Amino acid sequence: LLVVTYGTVLFGIERFVHARIKALYRTVHDLRRGSTGTPGEQMKGDVLGQVHAEVRAWARERNTEIAELEAREQFRREFIGNLAHELKTPIFNIQGYILTLLEGGLEDERVNRDFLDRASNGVDRLIKLVEDLDLITKLESGVIGLHEEDIDLHDLVRTSMEGVDLAANERGIRLVNAVPAATLVRGDRARLEQVLTNLFNNAIVYGREGGTCTVSTYPLGEQQVVEVTDDGIGMAKEHLPRVFERFYRVGKSRSRNEGGSGLGLAIVKHIMEAHHQTITVKSTEGAGSIFSITLQRV
């Protein structure tokens, strides 16, 4: 009788534990599916093994989500820090010039003009930074629509080069338009001109004095690939995955001295994404970089 009673109790405990494990499994399974009210799948066979596998998979998913959240938080901190630095530099410069003028510089016409010009340049840099941030925000939210049309790519490259010709001449960089005439693509002309201008400015800032920046193109399926090639300082491989991030700079001192906002390549990326096209970069440290964009071929 004692043995029968013991067996009955043991069987009851086993069924109780088994039922609770099944309930736990259904709960974990439903949570993975994003459901809180729908019963999960019924289990058969190795209950503990299935629970173990399900919990491990659920833990891996949570760890992945945590890693993504940590990466976003790191990006947010870097963005705020970089933005504060980009705003602080011109503001402090402007403040210094104005204080110098107030402390006696106004009496010297030469110093007066020089410091006012420098303060004006600082204001222009702030305006450019705010405008670029506003543009990126609008591109991300889809507020800015594209006015697509058929574009002569050779002419687009030519007009874009004319806008940066003075800056290129100051560093002795030769701009070469190797795009054949009558190469037609489709897109928003104003935005694509901004893309090329930003890529040219990047090539000028990081290019080699007396070097060359060349634009070439070739068809690839229904797309037209456009390559902007420079023979400048190039980039190490570890920089390439981040080069299109806001405020990310490879050569911080040179680009800041040139007065860039640090948003040029980020804007390029967003404009290309708005066109449902791509931009990629290949670079060799000490040998130069190649930025490639795709456009819809006509």
Where are these regions (language model features)?
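Short helix-loop "hinge" at the ATP-lid/N-box region of the Bergerat-fold HATPase_c
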Residues: 203-204
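Conserved glycine-rich
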Residues: 209, 276-277
